[in-house]
């Protein structure tokens, strides 16, 4: 199989870094857009592009002419009572989770359209969009916009470009460190899920790898719940 080119925004930590490592094992060329690159040092076929999604450029310098896939990983976890959320809280969550994705997709869409075999866009939502949870108003609103964007773009860009999203529950990554800072918190979080464990970065990355692959060539406009059963199941003991 010929080498492919992927852009992973937010690929320097957490789920994004795990996706980078999975793609790297397939000998693909990977372009990582992020603010930091410490964890990317020495990785073969991994190219770093300095990028802050709060201030995205109109043009992304350093990308190859053709992209076969794009993944947007940046996210926020801002859990507050609704009355304590400020306008700036809502705006920042929208900027990082939704508008950042919009800007980067617009910048790299010409590269994706040049893929001779079609391309794939993968975004990230959250289980909190479809499962109402207290203190999630801001992030659920921002990720709800991501789900709407996923379906709208999938319709607009078909059949050449597929667009899907993954909606995880709590995953063991640096972003969630504050929610998993003690063994008691980890156990309580695990118990809330029907599968009785917290998600791992690898759980999410392997689903992402499938959705980026030709094996998922008939899948578009979908939101996949990788959430330990939280969205769909109620286990009564």
Predicted features and spans:
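Active-site loop-to-helix junction immediately N-terminal to the catalytic Tyr of the SDR YXXXK motif
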Residues: 85, 132-140, 152, 237
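Active-site helix of classical SDR
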Residues: 105, 142, 150
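Alpha-helical segment proximal to the catalytic Tyr-Lys
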Residues: 110, 154-159
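N-terminal Rossmann NAD(P)H-binding glycine-rich loop of SDR-like oxidoreductase domains
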Residues: 12, 20
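Substrate-binding pocket helix/loop in short-chain dehydrogenase/reductase
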Residues: 81-82, 86-94, 189
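Short C-terminal tail/terminal secondary-structure segment
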Residues: 220-237
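Short, small/polar-rich loop/turn modules that mediate ligand/substrate recognition or access, typified
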Residues: 158-162, 219-221
């Amino acid at each position: 199989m010929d080498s492919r080119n992927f852009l992973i925004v937010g690929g320097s930590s957490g789920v994004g870094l795990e996706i980078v490592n999975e793609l790297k094992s397939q000998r693909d060329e990977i372009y990582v857009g992020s603010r930091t690159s410490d964890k990317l040092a020495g990785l073969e076929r991994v190219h770093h592009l300095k990028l802050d999604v709060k201030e995205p450029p109109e043009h992304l310098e350093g990308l190859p002419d053709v992209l076969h896939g794009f993944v947007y990983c940046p996210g926020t976890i801002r859990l507050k009572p609704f009355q304590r959320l400020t306008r700036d809280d809502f705006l920042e969550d929208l900027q990082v989770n939704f508008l950042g994705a919009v800007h980067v997709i617009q910048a790299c869409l010409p590269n994706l359209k040049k893929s001779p075999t079609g391309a794939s866009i993968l975004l990230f939502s959250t289980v909190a969009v479809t499962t109402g949870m207290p203190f999630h108003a801001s992030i659920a609103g921002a990720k709800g916009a991501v789900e709407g964007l996923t379906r709208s773009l999938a319709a607009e860009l078909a059949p050449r470009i597929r667009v899907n999203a993954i909606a995880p529950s709590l995953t063991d990554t640096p972003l969630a460190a504050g929610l998993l800072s003690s063994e008691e918190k980890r156990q309580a979080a695990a118990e809330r899920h029907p599968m009785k464990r917290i998600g791992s970065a690898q759980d999410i990355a392997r689903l992402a790898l499938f959705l980026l692959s030709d094996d998922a060539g008939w899948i578009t406009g979908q939101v996949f719940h990788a959430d330990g059963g939280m969205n769909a199941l109620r286990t009564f003991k």
